[in-house]
């Protein structure tokens, strides 16, 4: 419940963090009869709780692209969540991991940290990932990057038991290359 989150956050914020910002990452919430991965609070409840704490504490929220897509079962829900956080001036970070609506290895609408989709400039990718370069660009275009504390990636190479170190490193390196290209870094 939102009350439980508030109590937990109040306890956590009572500890000495030496000025550090405490950030929560939104996870999918239970929606109607749709199977959920985490089934936590709605983003509205999380934002409301953080706003209540914001006057006295340095707090924020991170939006994970895949987790928001899982919640909405679509690629527009991450943008909706980001816009809500921006409107409330509480967005602290963006995390990019992919998701699929039809992948055998990573599952359908599963929080398995699926890599980015195919891009002409990368060697390592997942064909069925909904996280395309276009979706990343659309996401970054609505955010003033100077106003967020960080961008990140969460990726997993599957199958776990036969993934090589080259593939694991390559997936992360290629993801950073895609982000750098979108952001204009060379």
Protein language model features and the residues they cover:
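A residue-identity detector for tryptophan
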Residues: 15-17, 65, 109
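Active-site acidic/histidine proton-transfer and metal-coordination neighborhood
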Residues: 1-58, 168-175, 183
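Short, surface-exposed loop/turn motifs that are enriched in glycine and acidic residues
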Residues: 36-40, 67-74
């Amino acid at each position: 419940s939102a009350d439980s989150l508030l109590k937990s956050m109040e306890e956590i914020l009572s500890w000495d963090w030496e000025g550090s910002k405490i950030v929560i990452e939104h996870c999918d919430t239970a929606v109607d009869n749709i199977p959920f991965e985490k089934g936590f609070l709605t983003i509205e409840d999380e934002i409301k709780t953080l706003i209540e704490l914001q006057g006295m504490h340095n707090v924020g929220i991170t939006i994970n692209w895949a987790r928001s897509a899982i919640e909405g079962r679509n690629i527009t829900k991450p943008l909706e969540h980001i816009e809500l956080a921006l409107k409330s001036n509480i967005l602290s970070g963006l995390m990019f991991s992919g998701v699929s609506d039809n992948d055998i290895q990573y599952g359908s609408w599963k929080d398995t940290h699926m890599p980015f989709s195919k891009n002409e400039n990368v060697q390592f990718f997942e064909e069925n990932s909904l996280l395309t370069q276009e979706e990343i660009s659309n996401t970054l275009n609505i955010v003033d990057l100077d106003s967020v504390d960080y961008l990140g990636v969460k990726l997993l190479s599957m199958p776990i038991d036969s993934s090589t170190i080259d593939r694991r490193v390559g997936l992360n390196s290629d993801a950073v290359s895609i982000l750098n290209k979108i952001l204009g870094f060379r």
